[in-house]
């Protein structure tokens, strides 16, 4: 019986070879299509590091210079920031609004923009996604990040940041397990320009891992304070991040 089976298989070897080739091709194509879908589906189940439900984005706009009520004296950076903070206070007092913060950047969690840099600790390179925030404006509280290493979101918002200070995500400990606490540690950055000195950055606070997009597993997230905001940055792409109260619909 076995001899007969082998004889039949040999007689049909060409046809069987084509069937095997088709089976392999179908298997490869199925894997090629389903593997990315599986990865995307899995990534979407991972926590973002903040609560996206109840968050809205409202763009900041200015009157055109030809408008009757346009005031040229109000267009400088000082008056622009004063007016932005005035609008921010009004937003927070609006019924149904829990908190609000200005976003004068293209790079923040959930945005379509992105900014990246590579820092270093000792000899270890650390690629990171950079988000920018204005201190003392409720950025961390409005997003609702998860705190780490003791500081509250309010404390992270209201620290007196200096140039080259950073807030980082706790997943950095995965590659720096021996440092203990991240707060207080220093990273450095070497520019490609040989004429520039090494720049050092101080870690002032830590939040849990943040993913900028729900379809990505994400990378290390760093938050850099914006200490000098110009008026054109506010009007060209500035917006308000608004968090609604839990019982208020986004519709």
Roles of regions detected by a PLM:
Residues 96, 126-131, 141, 151-167, ...:
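Beta-strand-rich non-transmembrane domains
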Residues 34-126:
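Membrane-proximal extracellular/periplasmic loop immediately following the first transmembrane helix
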Residues 116-149:
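The feature marks short, hydrophobic/small-residue-biased sequence motifs that occur predominantly
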Residues 67-83, 126-130, 160-164, 177, ...:
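Solvent-exposed, non-transmembrane alpha-helical starts
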Residues 1-10, 87:
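A short amphipathic helical element positioned immediately N-terminal to and/or at the very start
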Residues 12-41, 50:
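Short, strongly hydrophobic transmembrane alpha-helices
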Residues 87, 93, 170-171, 195-251:
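"Rare, low-scoring activations can occur
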């Amino acid at each position: 019986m076995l001899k007969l089976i082998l004889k039949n298989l040999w007689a049909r070897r060409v046809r069987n070879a084509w069937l095997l080739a088709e089976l392999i091709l179908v298997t490869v194509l199925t894997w090629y299509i389903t593997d990315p879908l599986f990865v995307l589906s899995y990534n979407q189940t991972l926590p973002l590091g903040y609560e996206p439900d109840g968050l809205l984005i409202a763009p900041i706009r200015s009157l055109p210079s030809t408008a009757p009520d346009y005031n040229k004296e109000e267009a400088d950076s000082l008056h622009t920031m004063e007016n932005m903070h005035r609008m921010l206070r009004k937003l927070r007092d609006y019924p149904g609004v829990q908190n609000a913060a200005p976003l004068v950047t293209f790079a923040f969690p959930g945005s379509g923009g992105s900014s990246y840099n590579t820092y270093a600790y000792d000899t270890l390179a650390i690629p990171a996604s950079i988000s920018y925030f204005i201190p003392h404006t409720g950025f961390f509280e409005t997003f609702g990040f998860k705190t780490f290493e003791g500081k509250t979101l309010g404390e992270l918002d209201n620290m007196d940041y200096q140039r080259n200070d950073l807030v980082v995500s706790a997943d950095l400990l995965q590659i720096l397990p021996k440092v203990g606490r991240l707060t207080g540690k220093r990273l450095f950055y070497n520019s490609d320009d040989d004429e520039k000195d090494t720049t050092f950055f101080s870690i002032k606070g830590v939040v849990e891992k943040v993913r900028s997009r729900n379809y990505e597993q994400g990378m290390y997230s760093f938050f850099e304070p914006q200490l000098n905001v110009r008026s054109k940055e506010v009007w060209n792409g500035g917006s308000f991040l608004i968090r609604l109260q839990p019982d208020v619909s986004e519709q």
